[in-house]
A protein has these predicted regions:
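Electropositive phosphate-/nucleotide-binding environments in soluble metabolic enzymes
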Residues: 11, 15, 35, 58-59, ...
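Internal alpha-helical scaffold of NAD(P)-dependent oxidoreductase catalytic cores
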Residues: 90, 114-122, 141-228
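NAD(P)-dependent Rossmann-like dehydrogenase/reductase catalytic/cofactor-binding core
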Residues: 191-192, 220-230, 234, 238-314
């Protein structure tokens, strides 16, 4: 029986999941974007200060999908559509899920809509929740959500993703889980700005509480169940990302609080800041649905240099 997994995307999340799940599979194919990246990572053969196990194979060819029981996408949202386009002729009936967060930058759609466009015969499935890649590798206990409208699909992926230290919960609200995973990154930038300005826990509490309201309003407008936002992929992920400096988004906000330019703040982080990439897309969707998101609007003004960090928070 085939017991191999393909993970597309060898960044922090893809690598962390390859390491965490390596004991559950005979082979894990970890795909990079091109041969040069594959060769470089193959020589390094480690990520997040931990070596890859011997059954993790670095590659760049989608042909390895033909030898896998499942495919997990862990690319940035900007690459999600192109990945689906490139693999649609290889996957046949192979189950596919993703840990990618955000909206499709080309269409402003949620990613399950992009998925349905390219893979009409598959059941979309997203995996999201309050986790950091570094802590997954360190095997610190955590919980995550597997969301799909199809019960067999979410049960399948729950079994794949769950380990002794990573507990998987299932949810049928694929819209709500995606909205939570995207909006929380923007709110974490706001939390980072407040922290960088030296404001205290009460400010963080207010931002998280009112931010949750913004997230919920948008999600419900898009068809989500408001209860979803009280769970791991809503409040749980929001609290984590707003409260810990392992979050790139929070660190980015702290950089902005120093009154430096957005470009300089991004350079200082030197990694993908998902909340910044999602910011304009989320607000575009919110405005088109007449949803007010004042915290997110203030984050946009700060990144565009149209207001100061202090004015935005106060």
């Amino acid at each position: 029986m085939n017991n191999s997994l393909t993970i597309i995307g060898a960044g922090a999340w893809g690598s962390a999941l390859a390491i965490a799940l390596s004991h559950k599979f005979d082979k894990i194919f970890l795909l990079t974007k091109d041969k040069a990246s594959s060769d470089a990572l193959g020589k390094q053969h480690s990520a997040l200060s931990k070596p890859y196990s011997q059954n993790i194979f670095i590659d760049y060819s989608y042909e390895v999908i033909n030898h896998s029981k499942a495919v997990l996408i862990a690319t940035p949202s900007s690459a999600f559509g192109s990945v689906l386009k490139n693999i649609k002729d290889n996957v046949n009936d192979i189950p596919i899920a993703w840990v990618t967060k955000g909206f499709d930058p080309e269409t402003a759609n949620l990613l399950h809509e992009t998925f349905n466009h390219y893979l009409t015969g598959h059941h979309p499935c997203v995996i999201s929740g309050p986790t950091f890649a570094a802590e997954i590798v360190e095997e610190k206990p955590a919980a995550i959500v597997v969301a799909s409208k199809d019960k067999k699909t979410r049960d399948f992926w729950s079994d794949i993703i769950q380990t002794e230290t990573l507990r998987a919960y299932t949810n049928s609200d694929i819209v709500g889980v995606q909205v939570g995973g995207s909006v929380k990154n923007i709110l974490a930038i706001a939390a980072g700005i407040a922290s960088g300005l030296g404001f205290g826990a009460k400010t963080q509490a207010a931002l998280i509480t009112r931010g949750l309201a913004e997230m919920t309003r948008l999600g419900v407008a898009l068809g989500a169940d408001k209860i979803t936002f009280q769970g791991l992929s809503g409040l749980g992920d929001l609290v984590l990302t707003c409260s810990d400096d392992l979050s790139r988004n929070r660190r980015f906000g702290k950089e902005l609080a120093n009154n430096i330019s957005t470009d300089d703040a991004l350079k200082n982080i030197n990694a993908t800041v998902e909340g910044f990439k999602a910011l304009k897309l989320v607000l575009k969707v919110a405005r088109s649905n007449q949803i007010e998101m004042p915290i997110c609007e203030q984050v946009l003004l700060v990144t565009e240099g149209k207001t100061t960090p202090k004015e935005a928070v106060t």
